A protein has these predicted regions:
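Peripheral interaction segments used for macromolecular assembly
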Residues: 1-87
């Protein structure tokens, strides 16, 4: 596989942290715009201690805009400023 590419399957169940190191939860799924193919949201199973009141929710999951992703390595890191109160 070429440098800089990753299969979505490898992302499932990766730990998700904010840029300050706080645990957000675990990646459950990814939402893709069917017309454009653009990744739009991460579907995250929130950590039990995470206050989810400021997040857009669907069932037991929080939805995070894909543009909040800072990096993907062993964990997924989100930009703390881009995820604040986006319910």
């Amino acid at each position: 596989m070429r440098e800089g590419r990753m299969f979505a399957q490898k992302l499932s169940y990766k730990e998700v942290l904010d840029s300050e190191g706080r645990e957000m939860g675990v990646l459950y799924n990814i939402v893709v715009d069917a017309k454009t193919g653009i990744l739009t949201e991460l579907v995250i199973k929130p950590a039990s201690e995470l206050d989810t009141s400021g997040f857009k929710k669907e069932n037991d999951y929080i939805l995070i805009p894909f543009d909040a992703v800072k990096s993907v390595r062993d964990v997924i890191v989100l930009d703390s400023e881009k995820i604040k109160t986006r319910a």
